[in-house]
Amino acid sequence: MALGNSFDLTINQGETFNLTVTWTDSSGSPINLTGYTARLQVRETYSSTATVVSLTSGAGITLGGAAGTIAIVIAASTTAALTAPFSGVYDLELVNGSVVTRLLQGAAVVTPEVSR
């Protein structure tokens, strides 16, 4: 996956959200994420101070080292507590020392749950 990709997220209220992506270089080889940390935040708008969802390495995000994978999980109990319908923005950043790379960004939409 190239840097700075725009990719919209649809989060279903009350459902476990799972997304796994692989960060690759221009030749398609995975980038080794050993030593990296990650963070993902969802906000109502870019300028909002409050976060709707906030994940970090070890707390919703798991990095796959040499495989270059980034697994994002939002628990069903967390998505159930989200206001729906909702439309906001998010980004996913990888941090290696003092270098921050925005890997993904886009709209984050929460669809309402019907079954309870």
Q: What residue spans do the PLM features occupy?
A:
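Contiguous segments within soluble domain cores/interaction surfaces
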Residues: 1-116
